[in-house]
Amino acid sequence: MALYRTARRPLQMMLFSRLGNPEQNYSSWARKDASQSAFGMFVRLFSAHAPAAAEQMSLIKQLRERTSAPIKDVKASLVDCNWDIEAAQKDLRKRGKVLASKKSGRAATEGLLALAQNEGKAALIELNCETDFVARNDIFQCLALSLAKQALLTENTAQQASGIHPVGPECLEDLMINLEHPKISGETTVQNAITEVAAMMGENVKLRRGFVMSTSLPGVLSTYLHTSPQPGLGRIAGLLSLEIEDGNSQLDVLHHVGSELAMHVVAAKPLFLTKELVSSDALESEREILKSQAESTGKSQMAIEKMVEGRLRKYYEEVVLMEQKFIINDAVNVKTVLNNLSKEVGSPVKIGSFFRMEVGEGIQRLEATSADEPVAQAA
């Protein structure tokens, strides 16, 4: 028996050395077990308030479809709002307005022109964004078309006269607009709609400018949009009004020729309607350039003057609409096209005004020149 006790003592000492004092060890186990129980209770309580993983994914998908916001923002708003989808949608709008405000200083050189038109009147606006990816988005395009329709509805004393009249952002931003899109529907102000779309797209979205063209009846107003993703949208626009003395003339013929002339305006980029309307500054500048070029030939003064006059005629053919070669048939100029049209309809036809605008022109330059701004001129 004594031998047995003696043999057992080293084994006990080895166990004690590894486990420590049994009483102390029991106390540490109790504390550890209690802490694990408390953590387990916390996890169970938290899990009782958060939906299951499948339901979470469903809520994220629903809110993503409603708002088109990035998934990480959608999930963050849902978590912050205890997975209440309505509250999360409001939270996303607040986040979006802050984000849109931060991005408002970034250059927005892409975008679209949107056109709305009725009898004798057309409105053209430019809505900018940062990338052509956003310009292709259907929400962005819906906003652009809605803004053009709103611009068409504006009325002021200046617009009652024929010609081209500016409709700047300040004229539109406080007006109410109804966006007919499932992800951004409802009535709100123009400025709020732009801010909300900017938040959804994650880019700076800006209404840059707008114009209204009107014509007195009888007459037609023709338009052409280049690089058009859908009717009413494009990157380059040409507008042109044809006026006729006899209101009973063949208006369908006028519409056809007017559409071709609007296309011509986009392609040929005229700066002036007639030679008489060429600005004195532009003419003097061109004359000085041509004279300097002619003098370098070393010819007589009389020969130099003839060279300058000949080259001025070429200049008129480049920048004056009535003198330009018609893009549909370059055997004739635009003036001849109008003369032939007048004979066909049996009444004099003239161009009342024309207008050309392109997305992003002049934005990236510090000083805009005549080539950087929309070209418009009336007779």
UniProtKB/Swiss-Prot annotation:
Main localization of the protein described in the UniProt heading: mitochondrion
Highest taxon listed in the record's lineage: Eukaryota
Keyword annotations from UniProtKB, A to Z: Elongation factor, Mitochondrion, Protein biosynthesis, Transit peptide
GO function terms (MF aspect): translation elongation factor activity
A GO-annotated cellular component: mitochondrion
Parts of the chain that traverse the membrane: none
InterPro entries, per database record: EF-Ts_dimer_sf (IPR036402), Transl_elong_EFTs/EF1B (IPR001816), Transl_elong_EFTs/EF1B_dimer (IPR014039), Transl_elong_Ts_CS (IPR018101), UBA-like_sf (IPR009060)
Cystine connections: none
Subcellular location: Mitochondrion
Transit peptide residue numbers: 1-45
HAMAP family: EF_Ts
Function description: Associates with the EF-Tu.GDP complex and induces the exchange of GDP to GTP. It remains bound to the aminoacyl-tRNA.EF-Tu.GTP complex up to the GTP hydrolysis stage on the ribosome.
Protein's name according to its UniProt entry: Elongation factor Ts, mitochondrial
Lineage of origin: Eukaryota, Viridiplantae, Streptophyta, Embryophyta, Tracheophyta
